Amino acid sequence: MKQTQRHDAIIELVKKQGYVSTEELVEHFSVSPQTIRRDLNDLAEQNMILRHHGGAALPSSSVNTPWHDRKATQTEEKERIARKVAAQIPNGSTLFIDIGTTPEAVAHALLGHSNLRIVTNNLNVANTLMAKEDFRIILAGGELRSRDGGIIGEATQDFIAQFRLDFGILGISGIDSDGSLLEFDYHEVRTKRAIIENSRHVMLVVDHSKFGRNAMVNMGSISMVDAVYTDTLPPPGVMQVLTENYIQLELC
């Protein structure tokens, strides 16, 4: 493959996934790490990507990748994460399930459970779980975001604040190198904070593409959660925050 073709392919991968690691690109193109680093440096100079230690991300931090594209990426990783999370949730539990394709994977993995009571602001989650007659599903009120089935707004935040549940299953758009949790929509950030504040145990579910991925709104530190479920070892800066705050890390 010519360099220009590889550059175009790298840009498409970054657009599709939001973030790609150097290791992924080396394996994908069967070239040396030095070649990929040169490619990424060239593309960063052209402002086609944002260069990160260990990979590359989208240059824009104001618009999220379309839901259908996110749904189709890292499916195996999301399923592994979902199975591990589901195994930690006893039958009869109460839980929040957040917006996002990884929380949606968790919802699917919970179909083998019984007598769960679930509060969600994710229409896709509700549609998945409604097949279970023994589940009690409470759908939060608010503004429906048609692009991904998320329900957001002040009404959603106030609704969630009425509950105190055993678990909060939380997704996130990006995690900065210092452990900051990043989102694209400040309305969604408020809803996520409400889930954190009203859950006894918060499980953050993220695949490797979220590490180093940019988004515009800072929700706060990853230290706000109780456990992180992911498919790869987080970057050193994030690991330091997890270790210092005794946050449980589960590699799936």
Tell me what each language-model feature is.
Residues 2-5, 9-12, 18-24, 30, ...:
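Conserved phosphate- and dinucleotide-binding cores of soluble alpha/beta proteins
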Residues 2-29, 34-99, 107-115, 119, ...:
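HTH-adjacent hinge/linker in prokaryotic transcriptional regulators
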Residues 103:
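Conserved SAM/SAH-binding loop
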